[in-house]
């Protein structure tokens, strides 16, 4: 994968070099263009002339036609850059003071390890661990296990991202097991705040007491003694060897039986149970993380200090629970909860008995978050989903392992829970010295009874074997060591259910019902019980240190053999056993005993990332590594040492508390003020930084301070912490800039491998943005909103544009080039299918290897019936069907429907409906198209019924071309000259739609929604351009010359709806009363935004906006393939073959039936541009001087041999034989050229052509020309036929469009939304007058006004209901 990435980067570097030229205005650099196309003076007469301009006198000014985007919304665009809100925010900010102080503290902690680190060659930054992992000290990850140094997985290591850039010398450097374990527990680079005493602290206290009792009984003091005592099985099977390595047994143990079963806790964990001679083991391979949202919905959240609950949209994706104030703005979270550091998720305690609980809480190592769902069932679903994520994050490497000795099993009994599976419970005692009992529940769908019987018999035979072992002292010693080892570590899942058990003098001991034990590896025995006595007595005071508070998440696996699984240790893995009260009592010292590997080795001041770092910080802790003979061996001496150490450590803990609480005051000291001022001044000075592979600042940046080079890795740590990103997300560059939303926000831009992030640095603001690069379509450079600033526009799929401003042009250009490099690499990985693999490969790679080795070992076993049965069971489907993507409801109606499609306009408006009706015919329905008379033969040719709608489309086209579609001048002329035309249109449409069960209408026809209300039938809308309100795109008839942002985009729809309705409201309401028998209506009563909408363009061309409701669907193009029935002329085929033989590119040029002021000049422009670009052209000349300037009438210009003129040809055949297409940008023509996968040049003239021209350019598959002259057109032709980047993008986009089936998707959408449309029709009819009664009722004016107020009250959308409309559409 790496060579492909390098190639992509080199390819981008060649095109996006340091020339700093405008990416949006100069797509190809001048050095690439041929000499004939270069023009040093672009301000000459030709480059400024537009030969495609409309006839003089038709526009209001300058003799040129003012199109729609210039006539209605000009005033909005004019005032867009007037207001400057930045002046009030010029004051310096200290919002990062806490982060800077924390980073400074981390730097001091890391400085002690510099001498122990191996030196690296070159500019590569030193790494804190020989393992190829990020040098960032991940917070809260000390309980995690590293995998790359495991002796089992080392030969099977795969090429992951973490291995890139690793030097062979470091990889081969030998390490001891102790060093590896210390290197695998990076410290937490975060100030830890004190929190409440843990729920399970009594369990830990009892555990400490147990350790103290164990220390008086003696045991072997070295690992070598224990290893020598256990006999090895030379004839062990492959499965036994794998289990020995995976579970850390002393010697291979014969596998007696295995079963496919599930471990039952708050979740059902499917895996395998292996019963060996000495242990019962369970292994489960966890599935990979999901990159899609696991659960989402509205939940109330309580503030940190404010007890009020606020409603947010929550989304649980990966390891992060994010919440948003607006679900349509998913790139701007209001906050997040990082579940990688989660402890528990549980329902709140009910205040009243019998009352359903809707509150739940999530506890992390930092704080507790309180939530409230809408119902108790929703709360339970959230808790269950959160528990699964927390469980998985604590087993992040992909597998879970449980192991406990058979001799520790007390009993086994059946525990029926479900009817279709056998469930049994195993009760296990922790060790012979304690009464703590763990319970494990296992269930199996096929072999539960067999497993229960076998284990019950095995448990019954265990006392006999144990009594036989006492005859020999050597086996007794081995057995005893196994029991000790088995009880040292235990595994747990967070559970709200716990049970209390009494243990001696330590009081009630609270135990999780799901805790268990597992076995150690060889390195676990390097600490003998005498050693354990010492560290249990001297680790008391460390509970006051900050690292100890967070170390509750840790598990005592520092000394164990590394494995791919993350086995959680006891229930204190979720709670820190920190003692808050400083009371003295008779048993206080006993309650505070800790294990060395759990607490004392994890102090904040202990730097353990290097291979030579010691465990402890005090002399008493260092004594734990001395020979066992130096340790006190009696309880009395132990108590004396403990009593002497207690006051000193209590005082040290209190001093640490004061030091942490006074960190803000320390920032104000004179010794720190200069560094703070330097950082703030640097923040406001702006600029940017680049980071290398190891996140060190690249030395070729301007004004790089040597201290910044050392702090580069900490920038990456803070970046991942700010946005809750995984360690694999490497920081590549950062810039200071302004983000323009409602007001300009000054902050910092972060660019990583797959993310573009922003964080506000303004006081009082908490804006954050997390934008995946795969959702970014393009990056354009534009002028800034304010004088002296330089703008950058980020175009996002299905979202409004983002505007950034930079202080200098160089910084802006550098950010643009860096983003384009990232986009190129991301899109290349997406196209090759490598991006999805990279997102999950690192996390599950080692577990997959371990799982594969275990499966291979299982296959090696022959003659074992249980193994074969387990293999068969693993291939069986789970009996519970739970696939959210599958539909269990058949939405297709049982009877055949009479469907009418109502549309007006040109051929391009009718063609999509023919394709849709052909699909409806195939489904068994009876479709009918109601349109103009001139399209009747074409419609009936395809076997579709036809109904007549009055109106001359040619006349309609004339006023659209001359005035712009639906402009003010359009409505003015239509109102003055076409009142009768609109009346005829409405009346004929009413007649054409009779005998209809379902009506589908283009909203330009204006009559459909009223006809559906009168007929009480479901009503759909369908159109070729955006018509529904959104912030992502402007209205197709109001596209500005420059991107104006989401607020402008949304207001264009509001203004257009009102202008469009006001122009026809009088005639429509008279028609409603006279012919339909309905009362007068308005926009607030019709509620057009509630109508189901079908857009017949591709979601890859116009991605669905995030703020579209569920009933608006982008289905894909409705193509009508007619090319197979068309025979091309022989001259056309010969022309294409000659061009191929001459190795010339072939382009298509056709602008449709447009009206220009000088058609001869436009023809000459086309001819000269084709010759200058050195291409061959197929010309469809439809422009004319109709209604133009009579003085411009000239003889026809002869065409050269490089151009072949045609009258018409099917687009699906023609575009498949050319290299590029240049046209007017109509919806149908644009879809045909994009479907063919050829670069597209768009010269828009009116209507939606400006919108699709902008989309083509934003997608990077073509060029949108604002003016048409020889200079610009010839460059565009040459670039479209020679720019490999554009050609590849167009080819890939064409393949995506061809893979879609827009007609079938539209039909399925109709089926799904049919019931919803029926409810709307019924609701409208209930508040309307009686239909089918053309005679108006004889009511007074006052009565009619009173009636008209009723539907307005019932149908007006209130603000609280908008959240139901703004649900994001799931594609």
Curated annotation (Swiss-Prot):
The keyword Transport applies. Residues 18-28, 466-477, 486-501, 1325-1338 have a biased composition (Polar residues). One of its GO terms (biological process) is lipid glycosylation. Residues 292-391 form the PH domain. It is found in: Cytoplasm; Preautophagosomal structure membrane. Residues 1-64, 87-197, 209-234, 466-538, 580-635, 1325-1352 are annotated as: Disordered. InterPro entries: ATG26_PH_GRAM1, ATG26_PH_GRAM2, EryCIII-like_C, Glycosyltransferase_28, GlycoTrans_28_N, GRAM, PH-like_dom_sf, PH_domain. One of its GO terms (molecular function) is sterol 3-beta-glucosyltransferase activity. Keywords: Autophagy, Cytoplasm, Glycosyltransferase, Lipid biosynthesis, Lipid metabolism, Membrane, Protein transport, Repeat, Steroid biosynthesis, Steroid metabolism, Sterol biosynthesis, Sterol metabolism, Transferase, Transport. Residues 1-16, 591-602 have a biased composition (Basic and acidic residues). UDP-alpha-D-glucose binds at residues 906-907, 909, 1209, 1211, 1224, 1228-1229, 1248-1249. It is a peripheral membrane protein. It catalyses: a sterol + UDP-alpha-D-glucose = a sterol 3-beta-D-glucoside + UDP + H(+); ergosterol + UDP-alpha-D-glucose = ergosteryl 3-beta-D-glucoside + UDP + H(+). Its EC number is 2.4.1.-, 2.4.1.173. The keyword Electron transport does not apply. One of its GO terms (cellular component) is phagophore assembly site membrane. Residues 241-301, 717-783 form the GRAM domain. PANTHER family: STEROL 3-BETA-GLUCOSYLTRANSFERASE. Sterol glycosyltransferase responsible for the glycosylation of ergosterol to form ergosterol-glucoside. Belongs to the glycosyltransferase 28 family. The GRAM and PH domains are required for the localization of ATG26 to the preautophagosomal structure (PAS) and are involved in autophagy. This is Sterol 3-beta-glucosyltransferase. It comes from Aspergillus niger (strain ATCC MYA-4892 / CBS 513.88 / FGSC A1513). The gene is atg26.
């Amino acid at each position: 994968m790496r060579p492909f990435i390098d190639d992509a980067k080199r390819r981008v570097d060649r095109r996006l070099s340091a020339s700093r030229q405008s990416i949006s205005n100069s797509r190809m650099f001048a050095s690439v263009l041929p000499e004939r196309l270069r023009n040093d003076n672009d301000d000459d007469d030709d480059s400024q002339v537009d030969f495609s301009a409309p006839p003089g006198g038709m526009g209001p000014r300058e003799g040129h036609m003012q199109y729609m985007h210039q006539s209605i919304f000009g005033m909005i665009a004019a005032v867009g850059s007037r207001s400057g809100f930045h002046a009030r925010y010029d004051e310096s900010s200290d919002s990062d003071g806490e982060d800077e102080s924390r980073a400074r503290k981390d730097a001091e902690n890391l400085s002690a390890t510099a001498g122990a680190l191996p030196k690296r060659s070159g500019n590569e930054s030193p790494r804190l661990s020989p393992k190829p992992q990020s040098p960032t000290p991940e917070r809260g990850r000390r309980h995690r296990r590293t995998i790359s140094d495991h002796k089992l997985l080392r030969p099977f290591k795969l090429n992951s991202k973490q291995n890139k850039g690793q030097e062979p010398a470091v990889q081969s450097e030998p390490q001891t097991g102790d060093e590896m374990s210390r290197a695998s527990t990076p410290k937490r680079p975060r100030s830890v705040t004190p929190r409440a005493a843990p729920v399970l602290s009594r369990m830990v206290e009892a555990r400490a007491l147990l350790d103290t009792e164990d220390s008086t009984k003696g045991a072997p003091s070295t690992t070598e003694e224990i290893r020598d005592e256990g006999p090895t099985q030379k004839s062990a099977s492959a499965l036994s060897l794998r289990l020995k390595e995976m579970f850390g047994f002393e010697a291979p143990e014969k596998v007696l039986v295995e079963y496919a079963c599930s471990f039952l806790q708050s979740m059902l964990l499917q895996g395998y149970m292996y019963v060996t001679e000495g242990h019962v083991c369970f292994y489960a391979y966890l599935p990979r993380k999901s990159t899609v949202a696991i659960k989402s919905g509205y939940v109330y959240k309580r503030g940190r200090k404010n007890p009020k609950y606020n409603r947010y949209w929550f989304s649980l994706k990966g390891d992060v629970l994010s919440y948003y104030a607006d679900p349509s703005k998913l790139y701007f979270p209001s906050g997040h909860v990082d579940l990688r550091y989660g402890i528990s998720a549980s329902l709140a305690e009910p205040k009243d008995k019998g009352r359903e609980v809707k509150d739940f809480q999530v506890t992390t190592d930092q704080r507790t978050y309180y939530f409230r769902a809408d119902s108790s069932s929703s709360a339970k679903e959230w808790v269950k989903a959160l528990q699964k994520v927390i469980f998985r994050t604590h087993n992040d490497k992909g597998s879970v392992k449980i192991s406990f000795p058979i001799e520790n099993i007390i009993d086994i009994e059946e525990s029926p829970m479900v009817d279709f599976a056998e469930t049994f419970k195993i009760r296990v005692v922790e060790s012979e010295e304690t009464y703590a009992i763990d319970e494990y529940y296992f269930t199996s769908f096929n072999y539960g009874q067999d497993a229960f019987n076998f284990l019950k018999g095995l448990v019954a035979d265990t006392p006999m074997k144990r009594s036989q072992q006492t005859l020999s002292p050597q086996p007794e010693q081995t057995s005893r060591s196994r029991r000790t080892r088995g009880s040292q570590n235990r595994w747990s899942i967070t559970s709200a259910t716990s049970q209390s058990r009494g243990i001696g003098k330590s009081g009630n001991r609270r135990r999780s019902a799901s805790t268990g034990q597992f076995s150690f590896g060889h390195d676990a025995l390097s600490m003998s019980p005498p050693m354990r006595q010492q560290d249990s007595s001297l680790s008391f005071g460390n509970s006051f240190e900050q690292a100890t508070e967070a170390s509750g998440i840790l598990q005592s696996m520092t000394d164990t053999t590394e494995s791919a699984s993350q086995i959680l240790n006891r229930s204190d893995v979720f709670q820190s056993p920190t003692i808050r009260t400083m009371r003295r009592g008779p048993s206080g010292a006993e309650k505070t005993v800790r294990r060395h590997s759990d607490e004392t080795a994890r102090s904040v001041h202990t730097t353990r990332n290097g291979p030579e770092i010691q465990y402890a910080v005090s002399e008493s802790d260092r004594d734990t590594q001395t020979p066992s003979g130096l340790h006190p061996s009696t309880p009395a001496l132990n108590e004396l040492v403990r009593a002497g150490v207690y006051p000193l450590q209590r005082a040290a803990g209190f001093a640490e508390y004061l030091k942490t609480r006074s960190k803000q005051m320390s920032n104000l000291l004179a010794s720190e003020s200069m560094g703070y001022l330097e950082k703030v001044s640097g923040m406001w000075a702006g600029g940017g930084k680049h980071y290398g592979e190891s996140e060190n600042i690249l030395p070729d940046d301007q004004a790089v301070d040597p201290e910044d080079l050392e702090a580069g890795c900490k920038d990456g740590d803070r970046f991942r912490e700010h946005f809750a990103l995984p360690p694999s997300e490497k920081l590549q560059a950062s810039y200071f800039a302004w983000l323009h939303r409602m007001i300009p926000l000054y902050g910092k831009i972060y660019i990583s491998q797959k993310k573009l992030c922003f964080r506000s640095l303004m006081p009082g603001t908490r804006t954050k943005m997390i934008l995946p690069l795969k959702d970014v379509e393009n990056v354009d450079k534009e002028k800034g909103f304010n004088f002296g600033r330089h703008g950058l526009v980020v175009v996002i799929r299905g979202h409004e544009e983002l505007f950034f401003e930079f202080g200098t042009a160089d910084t802006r250009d550098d950010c643009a080039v860096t983003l384009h490099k990232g986009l190129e690499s991301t899109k290349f990985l997406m196209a090759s299918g490598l991006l999805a693999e990279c997102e999950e490969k690192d996390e599950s790679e080692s577990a997959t290897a371990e799982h594969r080795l275990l499966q291979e070992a299982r296959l090696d076993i022959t003659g074992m019936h249980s193994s074969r049965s387990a293999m068969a069971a693993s291939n069986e489907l789970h009996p519970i069907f739970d696939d959210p993507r599958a539909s269990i409801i058949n939405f297709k109606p049982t009877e055949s429907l009479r469907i009418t499609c109502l549309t007006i306009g040109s051929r391009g408006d009718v063609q999509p409906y023919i394709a849709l009706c052909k699909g409806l015919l195939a489904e068994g329905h009876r479709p009918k198209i109601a349109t103009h008379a001139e399209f009747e033969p074409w419609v009936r040719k395809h076997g579709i019924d036809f109904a007549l709608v009055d109106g001359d489309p040619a006349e309609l086209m004339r006023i659209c071309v001359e005035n712009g579609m639906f402009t003010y001048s359009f409505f003015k002329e239509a109102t003055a000259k076409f009142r009768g035309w609109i009346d005829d249109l409405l009346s004929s449409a009413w007649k054409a739609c009779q005998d209809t069960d379902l009506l589908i209408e283009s909203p330009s026809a204006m009559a459909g929604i009223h006809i559906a209300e009168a007929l009480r039938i479901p009503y759909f809308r369908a159109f070729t351009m955006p018509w529904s309100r959104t912030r992502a795109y402007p209205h197709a008839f109001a596209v500005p010359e420059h991107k104006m942002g989401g607020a402008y985009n949304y207001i264009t729809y509001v203004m257009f709806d009102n202008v469009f309705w006001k122009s026809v409201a009088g005639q429509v309401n008279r028609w409603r009363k006279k012919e339909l028998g309905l009362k007068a209506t308005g926009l607030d009563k019709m509620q057009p935004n509630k109508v189901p909408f079908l857009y017949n363009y591709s979601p890859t061309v116009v991605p669905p906006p995030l703020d579209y409701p569920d009933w608006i669907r982008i289905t894909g193009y409705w193509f009508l393939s007619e090319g197979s029935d068309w025979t091309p002329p022989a001259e056309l085929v010969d022309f294409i073959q000659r061009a191929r033989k001459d190795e010339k590119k072939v382009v298509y040029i056709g602008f449709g039936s447009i009206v220009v002021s000088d058609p001869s000049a436009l023809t000459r422009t086309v001819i000269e541009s084709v010759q200058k670009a050195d291409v061959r052209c197929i010309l469809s000349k439809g422009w004319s001087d109709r209604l133009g300037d009579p003085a411009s009438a000239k003889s026809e210009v002869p065409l050269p041999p490089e151009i072949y003129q045609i009258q018409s040809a099917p687009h699906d055949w023609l575009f498949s034989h050319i290299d590029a297409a240049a046209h007017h940008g109509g919806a149908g023509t644009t879809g045909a050229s994009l479907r063919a996968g050829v670069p597209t040049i768009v010269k828009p003239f009116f209507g939606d052509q400006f919108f699709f021209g902008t989309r083509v350019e934003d997608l990077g598959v073509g060029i949108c020309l604002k003016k048409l002259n020889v200079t610009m057109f010839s460059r565009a032709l040459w670039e479209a036929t020679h720019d490999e980047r554009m050609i590849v993008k167009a080819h890939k986009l064409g393949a995506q469009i061809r893979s879609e089936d827009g007609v079938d998707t539209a039909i399925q959408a109709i089926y799904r939304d049919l019931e919803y449309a029926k409810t709307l029709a019924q609701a409208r009819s209930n508040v309307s007058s009686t239909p089918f009664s053309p005679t108006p009722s004889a009511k007074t004016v006052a009565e009619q006004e009173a009636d008209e107020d009723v539907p307005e009250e019932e149908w007006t959308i209130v603000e609280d209901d908008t959240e139901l409309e703004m649900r994001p559409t799931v594609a």
